[in-house]
Amino acid sequence: MIYIFLANGFEEVEALATVDVLRRADLKVKIVGVGSDVITGTHGISTVCDVVDSDLTPGDDIEAVILPGGMPGTLNLERSAKVNAFVDYAYENQKLVCAICAAPSILGHKGMLKGKKAVCFPGFESELEGAELSDSFVVTDGNIITAKGMGSAVKFGIAIGAAFVGEAKMKKIEESLQCS
């Protein structure tokens, strides 16, 4: 299962474009609300989640954990013990850990980016502790995928999807979305 965590103040396009792209690839994605099943994004758009974080426990079904950015959404994700437990489990078990915009800062604070190439929203670079910063819109380094921000959300989803279904299938999806 691919888990994407939403906390109040998340960046709507980063979250929902990513989910859309992954579901077009027939991947199982569960939208997890932090503290509630209805989460409001930074631009006032409310999203009904598939499940509330309190109903979940990290385990073997984790294939990937995705953290969208946005403020204060990123801060709210980082404060969540459940989000941290899922991120830690995924990282320790070599599953995908994916973060976009400000959210790579969470991985930086955990030391997960040391020696890895990574990217984030401009202004958060100092939070990516030990990372080799990139100018790319999306960066994959081992089991970590990071992306710059809202404008790279579709490419972020494409990169995550490629890890599961291959680049050829994701290229077709990208073309169908008029992104290539």
How would you name each of these model-derived features?
Residues 139-144:
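Beta-strand-turn-beta hairpins that frame and shape the catalytic cleft
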Residues 100-101:
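Short, thiol/selenol-centered motifs that function as redox-active sites or metal-ligating centers
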Residues 1-96, 106-109, 127-135, 146-180:
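Extended, subdomain-level signal for the structured scaffold at the beginning of enzyme domains
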Residues 113-138:
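A conserved active-site-flanking secondary-structure segment within enzyme catalytic domains
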